[in-house]
Curated annotation (Swiss-Prot):
Family matches, as SUPFAM superfamilies: Nucleotidylyl transferase
Alphabetized UniProt keyword annotations: ATP-binding, NAD, Nucleotide-binding, Nucleotidyltransferase, Pyridine nucleotide biosynthesis, Transferase
MF (Gene Ontology): ATP binding; nicotinate-nucleotide adenylyltransferase activity
The protein, known as: Probable nicotinate-nucleotide adenylyltransferase
Biological role stated in the UniProt entry: Catalyzes the reversible adenylation of nicotinate mononucleotide (NaMN) to nicotinic acid adenine dinucleotide (NaAD).
Species this protein is from: Albidiferax ferrireducens (strain ATCC BAA-621 / DSM 15236 / T118)
Pfam families noted in UniProt: CTP_transf_like (PF01467)
Enzyme class: transferase
Length: 198
């Protein structure tokens, strides 16, 4: 049975912790393939995201060298709000016999009951909860994980405390982002003047 990981996110920008998590997921979950899915019109984001073509290009640059990783643009091409369940349904239709692993951070996993058709998400994929470095209460079980034990597993995430929010702030302040984003991504951001305040 094919094992496919699904890792969604804004990737605004993608950074070294994203890549480390992808590598950890491929190894620990023994995945045949991992689909990196940049978020489309995210219903839960309060911040305006960078334009889709930029986020797609940065994701392609960030994950280009990783084997078995495919950057999947389907959510960016979707019209209207982008829901994870729709993406999983599409994947299930493409690979009906595959086993799917949805990779989420702890904060996302705890918010899962607020997601569109979240019960179906639990049927379509195993939820792999990545514990962030230095997170408060890291590793503590939450209600849904306790009540749906068979649909959850923990994914040990490398201890890299890097955030896209910090990276955007550093670009805006013209500070170094060395060791936070890959050089091709940093060059792309600089070339397109992303994250610059007016």
């Amino acid at each position: 049975m094919k094992r496919i990981g699904v890792f969604g996110g804004a990737f605004d920008p993608p950074h070294v912790a994203h890549a480390a998590l992808v590598k950890a997921a491929l190894a620990e979950l023994q995945l045949d393939e991992l689909r990196v899915v940049p978020t489309g019109e995210a219903w839960h984001k309060t911040r305006t995201l960078s334009p889709a073509p930029h986020r797609l290009a940065m994701a392609q640059l960030a994950f280009a060298e990783l084997p078995h990783v495919v950057v999947d643009p389907r959510e960016l091409e979707r019209v209207g709000p982008s829901y994870t369940v729709d993406t999983l349904r599409e994947f299930k239709a493409l690979w009906p016999t595959a086993e799917f692993f949805l990779i989420l951070g702890e904060d996302q996993a705890q918010a899962l009951p607020s997601w569109h058709d979240w019960q179906e998400i639990l049927q379509l994929a195993i939820i792999c909860v990545a514990t962030r470095a230095c997170s408060t209460g890291a590793g503590a079980k939450f209600d849904l994980e306790t009540t749906h034990k068979s649909r959850f597993r923990r994914l040990l995430m490398p201890a890299l405390n890097v955030s896209a929010t910090d990276i955007r702030a550093r670009f805006a302040a013209h500070l170094s982002v060395a060791d936070m984003v890959f050089e091709p991504v940093a060059r792309y951001i600089a070339h397109h003047h992303l994250y610059q305040t007016a």
